[in-house]
Every structure is written in structure tokens, then in C-alpha cells.
Amino acid sequence: MSMTLHFALDPELTPELRAEIVTLWTDATNAGGAVGFVPPATEDRVWPTARKQFAGIGKEGDPGADRLLIARSGDVLAGVLFFESMRFDLMDHWRLLKRVMVAPSLQGRGYGVELMAEAERIGRDWGLAGLRLTARGGMGLEKFYGRCGYTEVGRVPGAIRVAPGDERDDITFWRDLRPQA
């Protein structure tokens, strides 16, 4: 039986939480997750990218700022994702989900689906028209995101080079949040 997830939108980004996120990010990468790096990854390698991601986070009501959603199972950081703003008025009606991660030790419990459902609930509460995300091809993520209600809307062949001679498609998914008539 799995523990209930508890979500927090815009938690205080303390040094401790930053470190927890970097540890989760490193662990997710080393478990084969496609979150910006390839294994073997170290926290020292992840920190510079994490600092840039953290720098975009604003406070509630801060227009154009990125937002952070975390999930905890008890005291353990179970999942993370970022709502990234395009910082462009003509695209302010949707957000890009970035760094969607679940702790490898907690995978297989439905936490990824719960994290995506909470992101959708928040997006609807904000009145967004949709949520977009990108994924690395060759990882089997199409099936997971399809179960979460996302539709593949584009693919750039070979756009992600994970190693010399190993290029993967950059896949774009969309979750339409507009009310259906």
C-alpha cells in the first residue's frame, strides 16, 4: 500500500529543498530518467542547471514567473515539476512543464500519474488553455504521457544527442485544458 502524496505549490525554496531537488534530479537521471542529463550524473554536474531553473521561480502573483510543484510521501521528496512561463504575452495562456521527476525508489506506485494530475488541476485553476511538455524519444514516455491525457503534437528527429551516434527525437506533447462544449 502506498502512502498518500502531499503536494505543495510554490514552497519556500530553502537551501535544504534545493539540495533535495538536486539529489532527486541526480537519482532520477542515474535511474535512466530523461531530465536533461545522461548517466552517470553527479550532483556537481546537476547543480549549475538547477540554479538556472531555480532562478526563474517567482512568487504567487508574480506574472511571467516559473512555478514549482513538489510532492512528498511522508517526509520524503517524491516528485517535482516546474511550470515554466514563456515570458511572452502571446503565450501567457499556457505553461511548459519541465523536469517532471519522481524519486526512483518510489516509482511504480502511481506517483507520476498523481503528479501530472495535480499539475493539470493547477493549470485548470489558473485558467490555462493548456500544458505543453517535451520528452526524449526512445524512452517509452509516449505511453505514460498518453495515459495522463497528453497528445503528441510534434517531433523533431534526432534533436537530442545523448552520445555521439545516439540521437533521439525531441517529442512535444500537449494537454488541452480548455472547456469542451
What are the roles of these predicted feature ranges?
Residues 132-136, 146, 151-169:
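Conserved catalytic-core motifs of GNAT/GCN5-like acyltransferases
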Residues 2-3, 10-13, 151, 162-181:
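Terminal substrate-recognition subdomain of acyl/acetyltransferases
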Residues 7-99, 103, 116-118, 122, ...:
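Acetyl-CoA-dependent GNAT
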Residues 113:
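Residues forming the Rossmann-fold NAD(P)(H) cofactor-binding site
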Residues 116, 123-136:
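Conserved GNAT acetyl-CoA-binding A-motif
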Residues 101, 137-139:
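Active-site-proximal loop/turn and secondary-structure-junction residues that shape catalytic pockets
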Residues 103-109:
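Active-site acidic-Proline motif in GNAT/NAT acetyltransferases
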